[in-house]
Every structure is written in C-alpha cells, then in structure tokens.
From Swiss-Prot:
Record carries keyword Transferase: no
UniProt name for this protein: Barrier-to-autointegration factor A
Organism of provenance: Xenopus laevis
Alphabetical list of SMART domains matching this protein: BAF (SM01023)
PTMs per UniProt: Phosphorylated during S and M phases.
Molecular functions per Gene Ontology: DNA binding
C-alpha cells in the first residue's frame, strides 16, 4: 500500500466544509488556479464532480487531466483523497 501525504491525512481527518480546492491532495497552486478558473474553487465542488462520475477512478482521473492538465500522480492522489474522505464521511 502506498503512503499518503500529510496533506491527504489532514484533508480526510475532518469534514470538508469550505476548504479550498488546493486543500485536496494532488492539487497544488497551479492546478488549483486552473480548477478555480473553470469554476471548481472549493473542494466540495470537485467532490460533486467525483460523485457525478459515480466515484469511478478512471473517469475521475481522466476528467482531472482534461480540465486542469493533472498528471497521473496528481490525479491518483486527488482520487485517493476524495475516495477516503467519502468512505469516512458519506
């Protein structure tokens, strides 16, 4: 099993609330700005897309690549973060 970042652990440790999209694991400043420009300014907005895609890993990673040019590691980290958050809070 791969280890998770501190950012990932911090995110999944509590309810999402109004956290910025940049609080998601795998999403740094550059990707965060690209997502914000497309209207995905909060983590919960990205969660909405994750749920619309029925938590499908490949569809979500492809969407993230298309919308903000996320690479494989970034999209995998973001997917894992949202999946673990959903497992804990939904």
């Amino acid at each position: 099993m791969s280890s998770t970042s501190q950012k990932h652990r911090d995110f999944v440790a509590e309810p999402m609330g109004e956290k910025s999209v940049q609080c998601l694991a795998g999403i740094g400043e550059a990707l965060g700005h690209r997502l914000e420009e497309k209207g995905f300014d909060k983590a919960y907005v990205v969660l909405g897309q994750f749920l619309v895609l029925k938590k499908d890993e490949e569809l979500f990673k492809e969407w993230l690549k298309d919308i903000c040019s996320a690479n494989a590691k970034q999209s995998r980290d973001c997917y894992g973060c949202l999946k673990e958050w959903c497992d804990a809070f939904l």
